[in-house]
């Protein structure tokens, strides 16, 4: 069954009490003594997350499920709601049922407060058939506790600002700034919450509802 907040929190509290931060892998690195800097997580076959994505009305009912079925040095692959999902080793989504990107870099490990980077990527938004490019500046701005439907987690807070350009299927032009604030939590090895302000799609929120680690 899925592990909810109480289970993961008990694991992380036990780790904090150990001054040497001895654990069973990055899945438990939730304590402040260990997670002020965090390395790339060890994603495993069988890892499974449930998220809720909503726009105007908040919800806690999951509508997105990720499950990992293959992990290599070059790529992580699995399914999103039963359809193909491909990610980089840093957990950046390359291809999903909703969108495709050439060079996603929302996460760049190791993470620590103050780190920043810039990346450019081509994108395809599948539901509308629109495409274009975006140049994004990302900064890790804080390490704090965040509450989501799955519970409370110690997480790195990141802010990205991207200048997007592109065309729609009817050849109208996109030119705007998209801002996303998101929180990566080492314990469930995932972005547990993101809030995106997109002038064309409105405000969208994604929150983690549950996490089940692989065997």
Language-model features and meaning:
Residues 30-32:
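N-terminal signal peptide c-region/cleavage motif recognized by signal peptidases
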Residues 4-22:
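Bacterial N-terminal signal peptides that target proteins for export
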Residues 36-103, 119-215:
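Acidic, serine/threonine-rich low-complexity disordered tracts
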């Amino acid at each position: 069954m899925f592990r909810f907040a109480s289970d993961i929190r008990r694991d992380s509290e036990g780790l904090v009490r150990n001054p040497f931060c001895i654990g069973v892998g990055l899945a438990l690195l939730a304590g402040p003594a260990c997670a002020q800097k965090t390395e790339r997580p060890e994603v495993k076959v069988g890892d499974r997350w449930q998220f809720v994505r909503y726009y105007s009305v908040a919800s806690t009912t999951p509508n997105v499920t990720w499950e990992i079925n293959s992990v290599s040095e070059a790529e992580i692959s699995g399914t999103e709601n039963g359809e193909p999902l491909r990610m980089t080793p840093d957990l950046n989504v390359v291809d999903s049922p909703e969108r495709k990107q050439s060079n996603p870099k929302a996460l760049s490990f190791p993470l620590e407060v103050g780190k920043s980077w810039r990346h450019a990527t081509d994108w395809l938004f599948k539901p509308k058939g629109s495409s274009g490019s975006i140049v994004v500046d990302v900064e890790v701005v804080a390490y704090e506790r965040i509450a989501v439907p799955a519970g409370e987690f110690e997480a790195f807070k990141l802010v990205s600002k991207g200048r997007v350009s592109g065309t729609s299927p009817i050849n109208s032009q996109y030119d705007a700034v998209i801002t996303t604030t998101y929180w990566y939590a080492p314990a469930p090895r995932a972005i547990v919450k993101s809030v995106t302000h997109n002038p064309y799609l409105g405000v969208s929120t994604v929150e983690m509802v549950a996490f089940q680690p692989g065997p």
